Amino acid sequence: RRTPELRRLRDAYQLRAPILQRWRSEGLPNHHLAHGYARYIVNIAAAYLVGAAVTYQGEGDGADALRRAYKNANVSGVDMELARQAALYGRGVEVIYSDAQAQPRSAALDPLSAFVVYADDVSADPLFGVHFHPITNESGTPCGYEAEVYTAAERLTYRAASFSGLLLGQPKASVPHYFGRVPLIEYWNNDEEAGDVGPVLSLIDAYDVLESDRVNDQEQLVDALLLVYGARMETDDRGRTPAQQLRQDKLLYLPDREAGAQYLAKPGTGADAEALRLALEKDIHKFSMVPDLSDEQFAGNISGVAMRYKLLGLEQLTRVKERWFREALRE
């Protein structure tokens, strides 16, 4: 997946929505309301998948040793982060490494800076994995990039002053890792490598715009201009202007039968805006397949059958996730 698309998804999760950059003419209300739907969808989907830690079944000393090693390595925490990454970006990336005591450990890498290259044939076997990141000097100033390339036998380290230079340089170091296979593993969210937020991102943006505009309209209504017609308003005997009289006395005296006053404001569209808000909210949950758990239909008196029906979409979504997560765990 393209890096700009992944960055857009990351921004949505971190509430850096496009609405925050919207500009309006000076003097006009310009509220920016960003809603955390992306974070909600990702966290609910990930927790539903691995909220209860993955269990490994087996008998014998080998199985017990494996479970102890996983516990010491905090694998359940890594699994949760990988599930969150997969729900957001469409894939999570795990690296297996040896710590200072030569014990195997694992960590989740940023999918924006790590990936696996596969064979271009029916086997689609992993050929190597890449993890790149900027490097800084002692003063903290960026001075180039470093890339670690993981093959089935060793870890190669490349450094260059520019990102493009990584493609042309020679490895600065080569260290065997002894895992016997590529120790970089991708956890796909589905066969399309698509996240749960992408399909509803435009709906979330529209929801942000709608709610921001509703607050803007409400503020403009409070500050609406008062139009007075058919009457001549003058300074009173205390030297107050018509505007000062209205502000202080809260009263308009219009003796002429043809005179009148009214506020200049948009026609009321509150009902239409609320209907649109509810439609957007419904579509966000419908197409992400993550239900609104604060919905009154999830009240405590709901029947088991009704609850199962409400969670049907999330159950189906989780089955797909589980299939691909299980396959990555076997690596």
Which residue stretches match the model-derived regions?
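A short, surface-exposed helix-loop junction/capping segment
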Residues: A63-A65, G260-Q262, Y309-L311
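Extended amphipathic alpha-helical segments with heptad-repeat/coiled-coil character used for oligomerization
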Residues: L312-E331
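Extended, charged amphipathic alpha-helical segments
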Residues: L168-A306
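Generic solvent-exposed, charged/amphipathic alpha-helical segments
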Residues: R67, E281-H285, R326, R330
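Catalytic cores of large soluble enzymes that bind and process phosphate-bearing ligands
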Residues: G58, Y70-V75, G195, P199, ...
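Extended, helix-rich architectural segments
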Residues: R1-L109
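Extended, regular secondary-structure scaffolds
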Residues: A87, V93-E193
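Generic structural signal of hydrophobic/aromatic residues within well-ordered alpha-helices
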Residues: L6-L9, Y37-A46, L66-Y70, V130, ...
